[in-house]
Amino acid sequence: MTYEIALNKAWDEIVALSPSQKHTVKFLTDIYEVQVIDRIVLMRPSDSPASEEISVLILRYLIGILKHGYNQKGEWISFKELKGGPSYYPAYQKNTIKPILKSLGEDPDSLIKNLTGRFGGKLVEGGDISVELVTFPDVHVKFIFWFADKELPPEVTILFDRELAEIFTTEEVATLMFFLAIAFLGNSVEGVLKFNLTSTIDIGL
């Protein structure tokens, strides 16, 4: 499914579900305004239109909240535990896990600094170091890192609450994790997407 088709479908669902004409959604450190009548997602305060890719993700989050709410189950799971997760894992590993591992091996200090400083993640127990990050409101993602040593390469495990599968499909979870990787590896999500680098992504909404 292309982003254009996914975007139109999401807007149709929002129009049918939403009791309000405007919604404000925070994603990482950015604020977005969803304007239902005009069918547009704007970044605040610049009023710049969000990319189709980010717009779809924000709308799918909003649809999930409107339909189900988001009540954490307190059960951390990995991507492979999602429905169809093992099938999507090779693309997920290529697009998200490998870039993180590359950064962890080359410059772990900057990686952790981005997560805890720029994005407000908090240090928690696990691995050599672990960071818990708020992505969308109440949607926490945990990154567990093991640093490289003389015998073993670096490793990372990404966990999230099982409730996330109630508002996002497996493909959407993969896309969320990809965007997180872009962001905390020091890139601009909107900037990368603007240059059509998502054509290399092996997942779709």
Where are the model-predicted features located?
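Negatively charged, low-complexity tracts enriched in Asp/Glu with abundant Ser/Thr
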Residues: 1-17, 83-129
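Conserved binding-pocket/active-site segment within a compact domain
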Residues: 110-171
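Alpha-helical oligomerization segments
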Residues: 150-205
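Short glycine-rich, low-complexity/disordered patches
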Residues: 24-25, 69-78, 109-132, 188-205
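Intrinsically disordered, low-complexity regulatory segments enriched in Ser/Thr/Pro
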Residues: 32-59, 146-171
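Aromatic- and glycine-enriched beta-alpha-beta binding-site module
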Residues: 36-39, 44-94
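Short amphipathic alpha-helical segments
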Residues: 50-54, 103, 107, 111, ...
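N-terminal ordered "arm"
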Residues: 1-42
